[in-house]
């Protein structure tokens, strides 16, 4: 990172000191004294790490002195070396000499203290929250960062943004910026700054218009305005942050082709819904609630019906309501303007505010408990009225839906009572759902507005998401966030080191690729893979009785002890309870699973949601338009096996969104920003060490440093390294001659005493391991100290010598002066000397006059000359000014040209690098694609053959599965049809009731019409008849209700159905009462109308006659309809009889289901509930009947009065003619409706009869299908026996075949030697032929390459001649092209030489010419490379390069002609050798074919007989020859065998209940065993061949390694899954048996209870006859009730609803005791009323008996059949679900076994690769030889034909056989290398495990030592205190003395 000067930093303005150190600070840091050996960081408990100085080292302990003066003794591993002062406040921490935690921490701390909040750490940009405003985001800073590379400017979020923008423009690739961190770390602020930067540098400036033409602001304004709106609804105050984002967001900013903003969109994740209804004390809800109540917009307060005090609303006032740093009033205006800018319509804006206000009102809704019930009811409706008004709902409907939601039971909806707590929970869930859906809808609308439909090409995504969270209480939300960060960290690790390793590859460093993205795979798979945490959570959500405990147990069963990342948490006092722990990359997190199932299902009140969907507010209706309940979803999709999207769990939706996010990120080039919170108190400048270290671990900064340390984090250019470290050994680099910087660096490093494995040389840089650069710095400092000391000594000597010479000169001058002074003192008194003193001055005055005259003349001349020179000077100055201007202009032009040239060179270099990288990538991709295509082709061929081989084995399984699936489908269809029939019959009942109502309405209208006519008496008669019929119907309904009530006593199991019927009947009764009231109102209206229309009837007498006729016709029609209704009733009775017949047939099924399922705990509880409810219903019904009778009597009286009045008014009816004309048309319409209703009744009748007939047909079909199924089972058993006999026959034939093969082998041993000789000759010939063919092929390939190179050079020459002005870029392109071509040609030629050297050892005389040509080609390549280097060094020599290219062209023509000649010669030789080989091979194969095949068959059969006995052991030895894995596989084998026994035992136990599956399971097991034995036989058969195939195919090793590892992991996973499934199967079967036993016991108890109840009823009746009998019967009843209660408590003590059952039973006992007491007290009154009661009872009994005799034969059986059918259908469905679940589990197990076998086959096939074809052909020959053996046994002539056919086929396949043998040798090498690699991996794994165990033991030891040290410190401290006390005492004593 280059350090800028102060002048260069001036462009940043006042932000410069906050971005980079000044030059003065850098110089001071470099000159600061520093001792690298003693300056260290030391681990310290309070401060984590402190700066210290080493005092001494002794025995693994180090004594240090800290900066604070304290002395500490620590272990060596707790001491970390300090970086030199020049690294203080370094801008990129990855460049530090010593990379460790304290170095990173103190670098961040020192930069933070200087307010430099941005720091790089490799690919990361780390930012620390300053908690104050810094001037680093001003416009001049944005301008300063624009277009700057990362290394050219200080670290900043603007630098990251600009780099992403520039990469997008240059690389044409999407970019992403990932901003993570804890709450309060500054993620949202940095996201805003990124958006601000893009909105500044990529502005379009065009304003958008909506349809009305209103300006909505520019796209930049809208992007910026999206933040205030999202913050208002998605941000809240937390403990750490006043403006914390409670959701994650991914903002995509799209750019056009010119780099200008085109559009944007936002995706959100994990909105914290719970904050809507609950906040902690120091927090508050979302900002929008407090903005609304800030009273900035009073009209908003008035519109939302709220107050300005947030404490009036429970949902938003649980914590704080104000934030000092936020002005809610200003924020409201910003939010309001943002809504307008973003283009929301006024209606949508009002809807947003209204829904927000409704959520606030929801929190104030009150509910209370009804008296004597657990049912909730509203406690006031004022708040509900406000909420309903704001949501455009009906308040009564809303309250009813909350307190009495409709729940689907079976096929009908019933009203369910809710407790107060359930209602409050439902209100909270609805509030959260409304808020969440509104938030998501707003995001969608914002995206629609930001989508400008402009052309867009690339985007930059900004991810603002919460960082890793480790709290005291971690729930599902924390798991989701931490899982997201795991995925992001894995993504970063992979990306970071891929870039790092790409640089290694580009620099030519040998490096084995390490994918650090796999480091976190274990934790990620534990969470998201099948049978992971999310999978188990979703599975539990599907079970209605699942609890948190069952979820925890499943987690423990599946993962505890099996996954290293899953642990059981430690119990810590004072800490929240935890259920399991996960080891994440950032630390171990304890999770609490309480309430996870409810959170994941996220249930809502479906009835209220239905109201929302029908709301008049369009926004609310659209929010829930796609919602469907779980019941509706399941019922609507019974036929399908998929879950509907409407019933998607929270975890599934989260994973789907996360996968989309990761897909988006993988398609981009990422940039990483990590935000750090320095302290918890929001204090500027303060930094808490432990807090920051925790975040660095969680954010992956330390993880990134760990990855850096694995590679070569320090790197220096060769020139810089030579200049800086030449001082270490100057003699290593000779002076006076030029030497390359790379060679100089190599010599210099080789001459230094360091570890030479710690550095590598690249093409342009030297790379160092972590710490080595620090060692070089120490050595340089020592060397500099020596040199400076020596230099100082020389300088001091020189200075002293100079000073000495000066002292000598001063001495001589003093001597001279002293001599002259002495002489002057001797002569000064002489007379002549005095005269001399007087005359001397006079002589000088004369001389001075002369001098003055001359000086005046000179002065005048000089003045004239000066004037001339001044004129000339002015002229020259003017010329100089013009010249300076021209010079400056030229300098500016030169500078601009130099800059443009430098930019062009940089771009050219960048393009060259990119081209090199892309060409390398293209080459790798093409090679991979070719390899993958070859592998794919081989795999597809093998797969097809395997499928053909297995198809016959699978046919029976598939047929059986198809037949069983068909039977099951038909069963389901039959059951569905039965259910549909019952539903349709219920619907018909409803239609009949509706028709009866309509008939009544018609009769009433007719009666009213007849009242208007003269024939009023007829009308009165009709009305009376109608009323009598109505009363009869009412009586019938009452009787049916009584009958249903009595039937419910006998049909306890159908409670839900009967309750629904009862409520429907009550509703129909209420409807009838409403109809009667409506009739009364209509009568009153008619009376009023008649009074008004009497005057008009006289004019309509003629019309009256016609109407009377029509009325009579209609009356006749009504009578006909009545007859049809009676007929319909008869048909209905007939249908009910048919249903009763069907019910008898279905009762058998129900008995089986009762035995299988029985009565559940809920049914037993419902039995008890029903007894109390039936008593209550009987009383209610009696009251209802009394009220109904009174109402009917009142109606009759009222009707009689109205008839009397109408009789009086008959004379005045003549004046209603005009009214009757109008009513005539209405009457016609009613008549038409009546006729259509009659037709509908007749159609319904016909449909009912058809359905009855179809039901009968379905029952008969079901019987026939059951018979067919039984026949299929019998066929399967017969087929099994037949297969066993066939197996015996095959074994016998195998023995015979062995004997025959032995005979053949003995008969053909005589010709072995001759065939071996011929074989040897043939092999030599084929080797020579193959060598020539390979040489020819390589020669052709080289010719093609040379031809292509020649064409490219011609094009290059023409291009250079055409465009010499563009010589720079073109020469660079040619340079890179020729470099890559030369490298490729070199590699290819070297490979060709190696192949030729290996394959043509025995035929060197045939390829000497080829080697000579290769050498000439090498020379040509060297000459070409030299010419390319000349072009690269000097651009001006392009003409010379063109001449060289012409010369090369001629040389290539010569080479090409030589190659063509050689090609023709080799072609001729090849054809001659092919002819000879064909003639020889035909003769050879005639003699050889029979023997080879028989010999191969003999060997394979012998190996088969041997290996069949040890197939498992051979397989395990083949897979794991490394040692320990043998034991593991043997354990797995034992587990598999044990699991197989368990499966068989479980299947035998379930045989009684699953007889229809037994045959299928046995058949599948038999076939699996057969397939397994056959595959094992084949594998064992090929063992020896595999031993020969383990020698070659080195390329396959690399691809096969990952495949084998994956197969081993998948096999282990499959074994675990299989074991888990089998365990679940056993548990379910045990539970089924247990449930059967409980069902039988409960059924017996139920029957006993019924008998007891009957006996109790008899005893109570006897009690009415006498007091003594009553006491005795009461005692019996009490005893039996107690017994029954005890039995019920014993049976259902473990169930959750036992307490309620017990309370109900106790209440019943209390009622009974109260009744007994009443009987005791009223004994005398009972005796008096005894006779009356007996008479009443006898009358009631007689009536009841009559009713029962009349109706029980018809309706009782029908209704019983219906209810039984419904219950049986439900129970059957449950059993079928259970069976289907078991079947799915079984199929999964079978599929797992098949997949394992298939994978094993694929692994073996991949290992065999080319040899597989030979194996398959040999297998084909085995089959053919088996046929030949059978034919020989039969002594048939077909054997001869078969032999001839085989001879022909062998001739055709001979060539390929020879190639296959070579492949065998290659595969042998392959397998050997593969096994060696497996062993090395095992050793690495064992070493890693041992290292981890050692580290763990060290940790425990250290922890123990730390505890001991703390104890010793405490003891020492106490001793020190004691000594201090003693010393004080001694001191006081001494002072006292």
Swiss-Prot record:
Residues 781-813 form the IQ domain. InterPro entries: Kinesin_motor_dom_sf (IPR036961), Myosin_head_motor_dom-like (IPR001609), Myosin_N (IPR004009), Myosin_S1_N (IPR008989), Myosin_tail (IPR002928), P-loop_NTPase (IPR027417), XRCC4-like_C (IPR014751). One of its GO terms (biological process) is muscle contraction. The gene is MYH8. This is Myosin-8. The modification Phosphothreonine is found at residues 66, 71, 419, 1264, 1285, 1466, 1500, 1516, 1729. It is found in: Cytoplasm, Myofibril. Residues 658-680, 760-774 are annotated as: Actin-binding.
């Amino acid at each position: 990172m280059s350090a800028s000067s102060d002048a260069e930093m001036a462009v940043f303005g006042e932000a410069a000191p906050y971005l980079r150190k000044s030059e003065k600070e850098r110089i001071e840091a470099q000159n600061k004294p520093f001792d690298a050996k003693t300056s260290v960081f030391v681990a310290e408990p309070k401060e984590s790490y402190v700066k210290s100085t080493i005092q001494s080292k002794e025995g693994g302990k180090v004594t240090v002195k800290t900066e604070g003066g304290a002395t500490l003794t620590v272990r060596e591993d707790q001491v970390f070396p300090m970086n030199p002062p020049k690294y203080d406040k370094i801008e990129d921490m990855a460049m530090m000499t010593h990379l460790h935690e304290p170095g990173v921490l103190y670098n961040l701390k020192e930069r933070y203290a200087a307010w430099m909040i941005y720091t790089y750490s490799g690919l990361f940009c780390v930012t620390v929250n300053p908690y104050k405003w810094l001037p680093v985001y001003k416009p001049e800073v944005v301008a300063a960062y624009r277009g700057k590379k990362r290394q050219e400017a200080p670290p900043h979020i603007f630098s990251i943004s600009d780099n992403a923008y520039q990469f997008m423009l240059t690389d044409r690739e999407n970019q992403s910026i990932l901003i993570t961190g804890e709450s309060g770390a500054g993620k949202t602020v940095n996201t805003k700054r990124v958006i601000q930067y893009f909105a500044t540098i990529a502005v379009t400036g065009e304003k958008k218009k909506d349809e009305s033409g209103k300006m909505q602001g520019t796209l930049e304004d809208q992007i910026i305005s999206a933040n205030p709106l999202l913050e208002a609804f998605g941000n809240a105050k937390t403990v750490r942050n006043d403006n914390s984002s409670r959701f994650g967001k991914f903002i995509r900013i799209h750019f056009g082709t010119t780099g200008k903003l085109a559009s944007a969109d936002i995706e959100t994740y994990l909105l914290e819904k719970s904050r809507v209804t609950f906040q902690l004390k120091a927090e508050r809800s979302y900002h929008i609630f407090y903005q609304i109540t800030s009273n900035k917009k009073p009209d908003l307060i008035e519109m939302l019906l709220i107050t300005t005090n947030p404490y009036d609303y429970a949902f938003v006032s649980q914590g704080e309501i104000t934030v000092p740093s936020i002005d809610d009033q200003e924020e409201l205006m910003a939010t309001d303007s943002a809504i307008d800018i973003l283009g929301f319509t006024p209606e949508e804006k009002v809807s947003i505010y209204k829904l927000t206000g409704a959520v606030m009102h929801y929190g104030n809704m009150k509910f209370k408990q009804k008296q004597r019930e657990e049912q909730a009811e509203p406690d006031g409706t004022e708040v509900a009225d406000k909420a309903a008004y704001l949501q455009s709902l009906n308040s009564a409907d809303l309250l009813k839906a909350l307190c009495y939601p409709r729940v689907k039971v079976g096929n009908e909806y019933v009203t369910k009572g809710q407790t107060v707590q359930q209602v409050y929970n439902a209100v909270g869930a609805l509030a959260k759902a409304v808020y969440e859906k509104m938030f998501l809808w707003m995001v969608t609308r914002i995206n629609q507005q930001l989508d400008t439909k402009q052309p867009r090409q690339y985007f930059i995504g900004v991810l603002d998401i919460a960082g890793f969270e480790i709290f005291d209480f971690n729930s599902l939300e924390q798991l989701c966030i931490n899982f997201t960060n795991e995925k992001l960290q894995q993504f970063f690790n992979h990306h970071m080191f891929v870039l790092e390793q790409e640089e290694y590859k580009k620099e030519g460093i040998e490096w084995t690729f390490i994918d650090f993205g796999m480091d976190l795979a274990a934790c990620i798979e534990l969470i998201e893979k099948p049978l992971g945490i999310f999978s188990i959570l979703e599975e539990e959500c599907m079970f209605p009785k699942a609890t948190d405990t069952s979820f925890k147990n499943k987690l423990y069963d599946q993962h505890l002890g099996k996954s290293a990342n899953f642990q059981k948490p430690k119990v810590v006092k004072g800490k929240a309870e935890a259920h399991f722990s996960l080891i994440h990359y950032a630390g171990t997190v304890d999770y609490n699973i309480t309430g996870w199932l409810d959170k994941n299902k996220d249930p809502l009140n479906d009835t209220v949601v239905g109201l929302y969907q029908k709301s008049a507010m369009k926004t609310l209706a659209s929010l829930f338009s796609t919602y469907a309940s779980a019941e509706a979803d399941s019922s609507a999709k019974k036929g399908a096996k998929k879950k509907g999207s409407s019933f998607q769990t929270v975890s599934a939706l989260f994973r789907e969104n996360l996968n989309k996010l990761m897909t988006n990120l993988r398609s981009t080039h990422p940039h990483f920003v990590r935000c750090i919170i320095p302290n918890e108190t929001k204090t500027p400048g303060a930094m808490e060490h432990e807090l920051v270290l925790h975040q660095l671990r969680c954010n992956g900064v330390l993880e990134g440093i760990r990855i850096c340390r694995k590679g070569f984090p320090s790197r220096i250019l060769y020139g810089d390294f030579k200049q800086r470290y030449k001082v270490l050994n100057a003699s290593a680099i000779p002076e006076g001659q030029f030497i390359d910087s790379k060679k100089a660096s190599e010599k210099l490093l080789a001459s230094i005493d360091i570890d030479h494995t710690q550095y590598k040389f690249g093409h342009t840089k030297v790379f160092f391991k972590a710490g080595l650069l620090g060692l070089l710095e120490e050595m340089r400092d020592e060397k500099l100290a020596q040199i400076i000391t020596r230099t100082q000594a020389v300088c001091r000597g020189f200075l002293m010598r100079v000073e000495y010479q000066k002292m000598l000169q001063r001495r001589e001058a003093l001597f001279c002066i002293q001599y002259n002074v002495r002489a002057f003192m001797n002569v000064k008194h002489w007379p002549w000397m005095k005269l001399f003193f007087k005359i001397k001055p006079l002589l000088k005055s004369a001389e001075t006059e002369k001098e003055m005259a001359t000086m005046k003349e000179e002065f005048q001349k000089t003045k004239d000359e000066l004037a001339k020179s001044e004129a000339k000077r002015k002229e020259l100055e003017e010329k100089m000014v013009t010249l300076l201007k021209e010079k400056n202009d030229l300098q500016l032009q030169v500078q601009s040209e130099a800059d443009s040239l430098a930019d062009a060179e940089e771009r050219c270099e960048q393009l060259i690098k990119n081209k090199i990288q892309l060409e390398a990538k293209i080459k790798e991709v093409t090679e991979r694609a070719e390899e993958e295509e070859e592998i794919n082709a081989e795999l597809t061929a093998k797969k097809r053959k395997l499928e053909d081989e297995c198809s016959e084995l699978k046919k029976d399984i598939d047929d059986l599965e198809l037949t069983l699936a068909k039977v099951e489908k038909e069963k389901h269809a039959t059951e569905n049809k039965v259910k549909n029939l019952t539903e349709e019959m219920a619907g018909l009942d409803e239609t009949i009731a509706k028709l009866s109502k309509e008939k009544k309405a018609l009769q009433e209208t007719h009666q009213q019409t007849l009242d208007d006519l003269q024939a009023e008496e007829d009308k009165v008669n009709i009305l009376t008849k109608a009323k009598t019929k109505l009363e009869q119907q009412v009586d019938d309904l009452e009787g049916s209700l009584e009958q249903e009530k009595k039937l419910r006593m006998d049909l306890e199991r159908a409670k839900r159905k009967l309750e629904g019927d009862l409520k429907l009947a009550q509703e129909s009764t209420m409807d009838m009462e409403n109809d009667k009231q409506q009739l009364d109102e209509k009568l009153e209206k008619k009376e009023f109308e008649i009074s008004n229309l009497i005057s008009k009837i006289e004019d309509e007498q003629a019309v009256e006659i016609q109407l009377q006729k029509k009325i009579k016709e209609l009356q006749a029609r009504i009578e006909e309809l009545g007859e049809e209704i009676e007929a319909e009733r008869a048909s209905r009775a007939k249908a009910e009889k048919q249903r009763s017949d069907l019910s008898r047939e279905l009762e058998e099924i129900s008995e089986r289901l009762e035995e299988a399922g029985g009565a559940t705990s809920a049914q037993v509880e419902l039995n008890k509930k029903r007894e109390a409810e039936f008593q209550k219903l009987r009383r209610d019904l009696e009251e209802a009947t009394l009220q109904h009778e009174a109402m009917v009597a009142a109606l009759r009286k009222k009707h009689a009065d109205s008839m009397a009045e109408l009789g009086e008014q008959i004379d005045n009816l003549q004046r209603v003619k005009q009214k009757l004309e109008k009513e005539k048309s209405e009457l016609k319409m009613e008549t038409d409706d009546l006729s259509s209703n009659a037709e509908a009744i007749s159609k319904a009748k016909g449909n009912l009869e058809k359905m009855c007939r179809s039901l009968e047909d379905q029952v008969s079909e079901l019987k026939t299908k059951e018979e067919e199924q039984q026949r299929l089972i019998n066929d399967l058993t017969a087929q099994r026996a037949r297969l066993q006999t066939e197996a015996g026959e095959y074994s016998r034939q195998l023995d015979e075949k062995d004997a025959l093969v032995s005979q053949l082998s003995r008969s053909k041993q005589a010709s072995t030697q001759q065939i071996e000789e011929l074989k040897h000759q043939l092999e030599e010939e084929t080797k020579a032929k193959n060598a020539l063919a390979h040489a020819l092929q390589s020669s052709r390939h080289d010719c093609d390459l040379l031809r292509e190179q020649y064409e490219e050079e011609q094009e290059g020459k023409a291009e250079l001649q055409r465009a010499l002005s563009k010589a720079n870029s073109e020469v660079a392109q040619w340079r890179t092209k020729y470099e890559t071509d030369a490298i490729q040609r070199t590699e290819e030629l070297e490979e060709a030489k190696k192949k030729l050297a290996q394959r043509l050892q025995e035929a060197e005389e045939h390829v000497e010419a080829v080697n000579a040509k290769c050498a000439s080609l090498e020379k040509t390549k060297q000459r070409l490379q030299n010419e390319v280097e000349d072009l690269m060094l000097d651009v001006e020599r392009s003409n010379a390069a063109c001449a060289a290219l012409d010369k090369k062209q001629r040389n290539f023509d010569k080479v090409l002609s030589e190659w063509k000649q050689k090609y023709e010669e080799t072609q001729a030789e090849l054809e001659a050798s092919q002819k000879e080989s064909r003639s020889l091979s035909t003769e050879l194969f005639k003699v050889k074919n029979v023997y080879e095949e028989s010999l191969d068959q003999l060997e394979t059969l012998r190996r088969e007989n041997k290996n069949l006995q040890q197939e498992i052991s051979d397989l395990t030895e083949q897979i794991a020859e490394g040692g320990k894995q043998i034991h593991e596989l043997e354990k797995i084998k034992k587990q598999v065998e044990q699991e197989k026994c368990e499966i068989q035992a479980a299947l035998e136990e379930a045989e009684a209940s699953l007889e229809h599956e037994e045959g299928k399971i046995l058949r599948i097991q038999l076939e699996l065993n057969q397939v397994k034995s056959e595959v094992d036989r084949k594998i064992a058969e090929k063992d020896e061949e595999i031993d020969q195939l383990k020698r070659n195919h080195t390329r396959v090793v690399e691809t096969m390694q990952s495949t084998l590892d994956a197969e081993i992991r998948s096999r282990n996973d499959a074994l675990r899954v299989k074991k888990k499934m089998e365990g679940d199967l056993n548990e379910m079967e045990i539970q089924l048996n247990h449930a059967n036993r409980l069902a039988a016991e409960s059924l017996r108890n139920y029957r006993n209870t019924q008998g007891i109840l009957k006996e109790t009823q008899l005893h109570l009746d006897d009690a009415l006859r006498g007091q003594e009998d009553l006491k005795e019967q009461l005692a019996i009843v009490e005893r039996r009730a107690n017994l029954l209660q005890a039995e019920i408590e014993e049976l259902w003590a473990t169930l959750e609803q036992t307490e309620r059952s017990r309370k109900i039973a106790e209440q019943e006992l209390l009622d009974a005791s109260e009744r007994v007491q009443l009987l005791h007290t009223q004994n005398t009154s009972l005796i008096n009323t005894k006779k009356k009661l007996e008479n009443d009872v006898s009358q009631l009994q007689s009536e009841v008996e009559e009713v029962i005799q009349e109706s029980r034969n018809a309706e009782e059986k029908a209704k019983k059949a219906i209810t039984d059918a419904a219950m049986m259908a439900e129970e059957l469905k449950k059993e079928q679900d259970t069976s289907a679940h078991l079947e799915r589990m079984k199929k999964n197990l079978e599929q797992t076994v098949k997949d394992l076998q298939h994978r094993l086959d694929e692994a073996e096939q991949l290992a065999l690769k080319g040899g597989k074809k030979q194996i398959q052909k040999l297998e084909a020959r085995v089959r053919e030889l088996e046929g030949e053996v059978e034919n020989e046994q039969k002594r048939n002539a077909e054997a001869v034909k078969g032999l001839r056919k085989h001879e022909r086929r062998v001739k055709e396949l001979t060539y390929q056989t020879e190639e296959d043998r070579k492949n065998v040798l290659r595969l042998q090498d392959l397998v050997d290398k593969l096994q060696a690699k497996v062993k090395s991996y095992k050793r690495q794994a064992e070493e890693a495990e041992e290292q981890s165990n050692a580290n763990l033991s060290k940790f425990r030891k250290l922890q123990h030592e730390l505890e001991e040290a703390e104890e010793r410190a405490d003891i020492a401290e106490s001793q020190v205190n004691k000594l201090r006390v003693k010393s004080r005492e001694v001191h006081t004593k001494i002072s006292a003395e």
